[in-house]
Amino acid sequence: MEPIHNPPPQTCSYSRPSTTYTSFKDASCGTKVTRIIIALFLIVISCGLILCAYTFRDLLDADYSAQEGPQQATKLLQQLDKVLTGPPLPIWDNEHLFQFSCLMQNKHRRVLPIDICNPLTKFNFLEYICNCLMTKQSVNVNETDMCELFCPPTCTPENYRRLLCTSSVFPFVMWHDPSADTQEAMLTKMDQTMSSGRVGNSHWVLVIVDIEHRCVTFFDSFYDYIASPQQMREQLEGLAASLGAIYPKEGGADSDQEELLSPFQVRIGSTVKVQSPGEFTCGAWCCQFLAWYLENPDFDLEEKVPTNPSERRALLADFISTTEQAMSRYSSLSWPTTD
């Protein structure tokens, strides 16, 4: 029996196709055209990616001009109202308010500086203002003994008495945080704000009592942060009636008693919102309003404040820069003297 010999397995051999690279110079005409088309296509794609990465702000700054109608430009300014450039304006707190009121007392003499040792809120300002004006009335008629006269810690009783006698304009500042719904909660919130060093939602508003003009003026740089103007007017009308009884009009013996005890006039000075969102300038705006009032009690706020937000900001920045140095003389918080 013969041995069986299996044939060797057949193998398949694959050969790679050879690729020949030719330079652009040696390539055929069709290859050159193809390469040019591919290069142009890649350039277009690259330019598209660059334009996609180009920010909209850069496109606005590009060297070209477009004619836009006045309505579109107005809308753009309205949008920019919330985007104000420049360094932040300094925050004026109660110490700055006191220093500025001392500066105004030195200039106008009829102004009583702001007592910052007794914090006022929307819960106690009516009673406090009435008590302050009643104290002035009793001092004028020599009914208050020196020992009974309450005066701020940084002012002597003798000096405080003289200031009360010579003052006819009484500015008061109220501190407010919308999260507090009682006087105790408001004072607690005030302590927390002072400890943290952050402004938070706190806000200053101004009340001016003018005995000579028989007027109570309220100012809120946010216009309606504490309450609506109508709600504030209703509260202030109660104060105005009390002040009318404390300081009756001068008249003869035959004058009508009801007319003599007529209430003070109530004026809501914050007719527009002057403080821009994101800025903590309520204290500085209160001081600016007080300065305008002392120059002319009948001034119109809308005539003083520009409608353009950038111009408003520049106006307040100029006011701050021109008064801060003069205010520094009262940095010790000592009350000015009448000598």
From Swiss-Prot:
Entries under InterPro entries matching the protein: Papain-like_cys_pep_sf (IPR038765), Peptidase_C48_C (IPR003653)
EC numbers on record: 3.4.22.-
Keyword list, A-Z: Hydrolase, Membrane, Protease, Secreted, Thiol protease, Transmembrane, Transmembrane helix, Ubl conjugation pathway, Virulence
Pfam families: Peptidase_C48 (PF02902)
Primary enzyme class: hydrolase
Primary residence: secreted
An annotated Gene Ontology molecular function: cysteine-type deubiquitinase activity
Keyword Hydrolase: yes
Entry's transmembrane regions: 36-56
KW rRNA-binding (keyword) present: no
Positions annotated as active site in the UniProt record: H203, D220, C282
Topology term for the membrane: Single-pass membrane protein
SUPFAM superfamilies: Cysteine proteinases (SSF54001)
Any one of the GO CC terms: membrane
GO BP: protein deneddylation; protein deubiquitination; proteolysis
Subcellular location: Secreted; Host cell; Membrane
Main function: Effector proteins function to alter host cell physiology and promote bacterial survival in host tissues. This protease possesses deubiquitinating and deneddylating activities.
Family, as annotated: Belongs to the peptidase C48 family.
Name of the protein described by the UniProt record: Deubiquitinase and deneddylase Dub2
Lineage: Bacteria, Pseudomonadati, Chlamydiota, Chlamydiia, Chlamydiales
